UniProtKB/Swiss-Prot annotation:
Gene3D superfamilies: Classic Zinc Finger (3.30.160.60)
Residue ranges of the motif Nuclear localization signal: 228-234
Protein name: pH-response transcription factor pacC/RIM101
Source species of the chain: Saccharomyces cerevisiae (strain ATCC 204508 / S288c)
GO annotation, cellular component aspect: cytoplasm; nucleus
Effect of C217S: Abolishes transcriptional activation of target genes
Organism classification: Eukaryota, Fungi, Dikarya, Ascomycota, Saccharomycotina
Length: 625
């Protein structure tokens, strides 16, 4: 038995699609064709069109498709008056095919697509991102745009320099123009000053302009006074001065006596140094040693006054700076080291106020403007020279600098590379082999302190027969094992070899003398002497290389420290010059204005005494033609 409800459902299911299809075809859009073209499953429209209670859902789907509710007005009455059946397939409205169908069907109509995109949650989710991008673009434009907030001026500038000049000339004014304003009217600021240079210095707080930069840490400041305070912080922090200067422990500069007994070394230094210097070193024994005793070579070239007492920056700029050139030298470095330590010592908490006030003459104004300008030029050139030398030393080729200066190149392994065979054949003059072979693979070892002539080859016995050459080749194979990190060594023949290649400091296991002497008639003593010579050469060269690397690192550290000191002095002098320029401008303007006023008054008095007195005008009259 088939239930009656199933039969009714089948009859209504076969009849309803005709009405719905006809209604949709009348509108000019066939939904089934659209779904087939897009490759999407066609929905069961029979149950939707037959359900009267679900009519608002049909309106939603047609709006999503782009029909804008026209289907409801043109729907046939048969489709709407059909029997109401329970709704079973509501999942078709929320499935992804309908969303994609709406997106694809909206393409012909642009107006409906804009409405649907504005109401969809995806569009609302993407709109804030676009707003943020627009806000960023506006922010970039606002970074360039600067508004004048002086009494609602509202002028717009694209550079902070122009805004600052506008404030100084238009709003602050000058006394000669009778429009001088010493009170700040920027926004809510109510700062009051007494001089024009004070208000112009205060205006830098409101303008995003930082022209004064620190050469040590690359920070920028708005006023030279702020940079001065920052430089004092560099000195007091001890980033440069707290580091202990002098030779490192265990380097070539220190002797074995200093390692064994440091007290004897201190007593010997105090005996050799004059009593004034010894007393100064004893007085500062509790503080870290900043200035070690000068070497003998440097102390001979320095004057006696420079060795005995420290000096202030003002005294150096006015008295002794003309004796030096703006080029780095040990004498100038040693002299500059005597300027800053008193400032460092006396800035501590354990020093009395009298000593502190006495040492702060480094930052007192005791020089003329011309002297400060010349000193600023000197230290600026010195800083550039030292910076360029340091950059060239760091970026230049290490092989070229070492070969040109006579330094020993340091290899990555303990094995020192042998010199080229063709370069040493010119000493003997035995053969004519091209000098261009293997020039890029091996770096020649140049010893500037030791002879490189035929003295090294005098002690080597001559090799006459071919058997000796064959035995020597066999011996070199045993003495020089294969090293993977070093390139292949050149082959040495009996006619062209002048110096044996050096071995490692740790010689590998050599074969016994029986095997060496069994094949040839060579003497075992000569065999032992060859190995011993090559080993000692390698040890000496490696020690020299290590000591020279340590000395270079110490010299580089001293150079970097001195460059920092020079930069601090240069920045300080630049701040002094800028302050003096501001003061001179204000004073010169006031003096010029006073002089003009007095001259005008004198002329007016003279003209009043005469019969035909002419009234002097403050402005030029307009001439009408």
């Amino acid at each position: 038995m088939v239930p009656l409800e199933d039969l009714l459902n089948k009859e209504n299911g076969t009849a309803a699609p005709q009405h719905s299809r006809e209604s949709i075809v009348e509108n000019g859009t066939d939904v089934s064709n659209v779904t087939k073209k897009d490759g999407l499953p066609s929905p069961n429209l029979s149950k939707r069109s037959s359900d009267c209670s679900k009519r608002p859902r049909i309106r939603c789907t047609t709006e999503a498709i782009g029909l804008n509710g026209q289907e409801d007005e043109r729907m046939s009455p048969g489709s709407t008056s059909s029997s109401c059946l329970p709704y079973h397939s509501t999942s078709h409205l929320n499935t992804p095919p309908y969303d994609l169908l709406g997106a694809s069907a909206v393409s012909p109509t642009t107006s409906s697509s804009s409405d649907s995109s504005s109401s969809s949650p995806l569009a609302q989710a993407h709109n804030p991102a676009g707003d943020d991008d627009d806000a960023d673009n506006d922010g970039d434009s606002e970074d360039i745009t600067l508004y004048c907030k002086w009494d609602n001026c509202g002028m717009i500038f694209n550079q902070p320099e122009l805004l600052y000049n506008h404030l100084c000339h238009d709003h602050v004014g000058r006394k000669s123009h009778k429009n001088l304003q010493l009170n700040c009217h920027w926004g809510d600021c109510t700062t009051k000053t007494e001089k024009r240079d004070h208000i112009t210095s205060h205006l830098r707080v409101h303008v995003p302009l930082k022209p004064f930069g620190c050469s040590t840490c690359s920070k920028k400041f708005k006023r030279p006074q702020d940079l001065k305070k920052h430089l004092k912080i560099h000195l007091e922090s001890g980033g440069i001065l707290k580091r202990k200067r002098g030779p490192k422990w265990g380097s070539k500069r220190t002797s074995k006596k200093n390692k064994s007994c440091a007290s004897d070394a201190v007593s010997s230094c105090s005996a050799s140094v004059p009593s004034a210097i010894a007393g100064s070193f004893k007085s500062h024994s509790t503080s870290p040693q900043i200035l070690p005793p000068l070497p003998v070579g440097i102390s001979q070239h320095l004057p006696s006054q420079q060795q005995q007492r420290a000096i202030s920056l003002n005294q150096l700029c006015s008295d002794e700076l003309s004796q030096y050139k703006p080029v780095y030298s040990p004498q100038l470095s040693a002299r500059l080291q005597t300027i800053l330590p008193p400032l460092y010592y006396n800035n501590g908490s354990t020093v009395s106020q009298g000593a502190n006030s006495r040492s702060m003459n480094v930052y007192e104004d005791g020089c003329s403007n011309k002297t400060i300008a010349n000193a600023t030029q000197f230290f600026t050139k010195l800083s550039r020279n030292m910076t360029n030398n340091y950059i060239l030393q760091q970026s230049g080729g290490s092989t070229e600098s070492s070969s040109s200066s006579g330094r020993i190149p340091v290899a990555q392994t303990s094995y020192v590379q042998p010199p080229n065979a063709p370069s040493y054949q010119s000493v003997q003059g035995g053969s004519s082999i091209s000098a261009t072979a293997n020039t890029a693979t091996y770096v020649p070892v140049r010893l500037a302190k030791y002879p490189t002539g035929p003295s090294l080859t005098e002690h080597l016995p001559p090799l006459h027969s071919n058997t000796a050459g064959g035995v020597f080749n066999r011996q070199s194979q045993y003495a020089m094992p294969h090293y993977p990190s070093v390139r292949a060594a050149p082959s040495y023949s009996s006619s062209g070899c002048s110096i044996l290649p050096p071995l490692q400091s740790k010689i590998p296991m050599l074969p016994s003398r029986r095997t060496m002497a069994g094949g040839t008639s060579l003497k075992p003593n000569w065999e032992f002497s060859l190995n011993q010579k090559s080993c000692t050469n390698d040890i000496i060269m490696s020690k020299l290389a290590i000591e020279e690397v340590d000395d270079e690192s110490e010299i580089e550290d001293d150079f970097v420290e001195m460059l920092g000191i020079v930069n601090i002095i240069k920045d300080y002098l630049l701040c002094c010059v800028m302050e003096d320029l501001d003061d001179e401008e204000s004073e010169d303007k006031d003096e010029e204005n006073a002089f003009l006023q007095e001259s005008l008054e004198k002329l007016s008095l003279q003209n009043q005494m005469g019969t035909n007195s002419v009234r002097i005008l403050t402005k030029y009259p307009k001439i009408l033609v």
